[in-house]
């Protein structure tokens, strides 16, 4: 919602995403620098670079461009599919985590909801928007996050936490600055309200990423992402209240399928933990 409110105010998306990622990196450097410089090596940095590209660069850039075509509420629905796609990618590339028949069924149920959503063409915007463009961009970002859940899970077992965390953000800052230059980004002067919202995004990023990084070391990649199912309910109504976004009935139909998918995934995960 904060991202889209800045776009609505006319702040350039290239500036928003580059500044947000750069500020997070600056603050994390203050906190992690000592451990980072004492522990970093080529292997750790390369692994951090890959995960940072998947977890930060890809979703950071695709999500903000998606918001030019779909509502923040609709984007939150796409974000809620991260656990579903995590199951998919775990099945393909991460053999250490068991994927049961019930989890596979949950993925197909969630995909059915997405198919219905795309068939509707609803964007959540009063000026129509473009579901194909916005939806595909959002899904690309989701794939990056789903894959990063797997690399985070594998690498965080032996790479020191602060070293791994800062390597990801440093790499993402470099990628973003390169994109800023290539895409012709320009530095903008923000008013007080815009600066506060951008600062809010920065601190939300730090909190969310730190919490995720703590849980991924202790729980499975699939279970860690289940919190993403809470996002759409809040996102839809916050966008409706503060940004005058449109709530379409198909959103709730899609969420129904996604929540069934959630129930099956949680049931299976709880069984495996027992």
What do the PLM-derived regions correspond to, one by one?
Residues 1, 28, 86-92, 124-183, ...:
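Transmembrane alpha-helical segments that form core, pore/gating elements
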Residues 6, 16, 66, 78, ...:
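Hydrophobic/aromatic residues within transmembrane alpha-helices
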Residues 9-18, 40-45, 119-144, 181-199, ...:
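Juxtamembrane helix-entry segments on the extracytoplasmic side of multipass membrane proteins
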Residues 18-19, 56, 60, 75-81, ...:
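Helix-helix packing/entry segments at the starts of transmembrane helices
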Residues 28, 89, 101-121, 176, ...:
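Hydrophobic transmembrane alpha-helices of multi-pass small-molecule transport proteins
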Residues 29-75, 79, 115-116, 201-219:
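Specific transmembrane alpha-helical segments of multi-pass solute transporters/efflux pumps
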Residues 43-51, 99-111, 159-167:
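Cytoplasmic-side transmembrane-helix entry/capping segments in multi-pass membrane proteins
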Residues 48-52, 64, 76, 107, ...:
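Residue-level signature of transmembrane alpha-helical cores of multipass secondary-active transporters
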